[in-house]
């Protein structure tokens, strides 16, 4: 019941914001990555169990000028060693051209969902991919840029610094300021104005969220943040819960080409439901349930009482009374 | 209080001495056989080097000090914050002097403790390699002729020389690194980065 109740709360919140549920097949024909996928072969055609939902949805959406709001809930699969790992992914996407309100809306829904389920100790870490687009522009070797991006995603600052091998000491100092952003006080000055603009944008984005009701200590600015997938473009974020070991999930602004070869702009959030279920307080999820425990032959007599309870919105469950099993 | 794991073995003394620069209380603590040491700023746990990244990833501790070779090999989901001024060594390919690094289309057998690193760095180079996973005394690979080459860390190279082996190529240089759990890095960001700031100052002094 706990899982269903959680989904019900999230679904209700999203519907209140005008989001519609979309469903997509579990089997993929067009495989975009190979690692950890679970494959099937049928008549020479390779199929894979979907490892995530967001990207596949984006492929099939047509872009138009009005905002499209959608959410999804469904199983995803990957290989963990020799074990098949099945998780349940939940996410929401707002497809629209890059705009401040679009990004803010998706984050506000996260806040409201957390309020609905009684989570008040969370942190949202904010980053901006444009900061790194700017930095990596100085490195001409494409292979090197690719591996530096991977180090950022893995948060391996040591390898990034070693591999970047920067002769430009000004740029190196800017990178150190990005990695250790909150440790520099007045001495943390970004010399390049474009870089400064992107950092300022990130900070003003945070201020806007605070203005809209986020508590200041729930938001941190980490200019070194990078997410997997190159389609991210602009504000990105990760969500952490106090007693968790890893990030709950994350998302951000993206540009992706759909199967009609159109550019699709959007902002989204996705997470694995199991991670949230482990941490939520069980009590808030308890539904108001009334159990009717009666001998089987009394079902018809009890039916009317249960119907009245259901009209009041109370879940009513008939349980046949079997003496010796149920008292 | 920040929880820090440090590795037992060759790096233990250096890691503890390093932390003592930032927490005077650790000076009073006698090491003995204790696995947990209470300081003023840090609560220090002694962990087996190969288990340590897991403790950080699982958030049993907030920070860890561990060699870069282990971080690369295990690829745990942690933040690799900064390299530290000790624990220097090199990850190398080594073998007998008469063994060539040219594959010539033949399968090359490599004995190593570092399966992932070997696969990542050398699989595309020779196409066909066979990795023989050993948990220690990797030099025995060529000696017993179960491998042509080895991939291992060396500090001075003495063990290699004593066994008639030589360094063929340095794959990368390694040192101790400070790693953080990703959630701790968000929740203790100010404390951890203030520590990193002090570490950077110390690193500057050492360089």
Swiss-Prot record, chain B:
GO cellular component: cytoplasm
Subcellular location: Cytoplasm
Catalytic reaction equation(s): 1-(5-phospho-beta-D-ribosyl)-ATP + diphosphate = 5-phospho-alpha-D-ribose 1-diphosphate + ATP
Pfam families per the UniProt record, alphabetical: HisG (PF01634)
Family in the record: Belongs to the ATP phosphoribosyltransferase family. Short subfamily.
UniProt function note: Catalyzes the condensation of ATP and 5-phosphoribose 1-diphosphate to form N'-(5'-phosphoribosyl)-ATP (PR-ATP). Has a crucial role in the pathway because the rate of histidine biosynthesis seems to be controlled primarily by regulation of HisG enzymatic activity.
Free-text note on domains in this protein's UniProt record: Lacks the C-terminal regulatory region which is replaced by HisZ.
Name the record gives this protein: ATP phosphoribosyltransferase
Organism of origin: Dictyoglomus turgidum (strain DSM 6724 / Z-1310)
The gene coding this protein: hisG
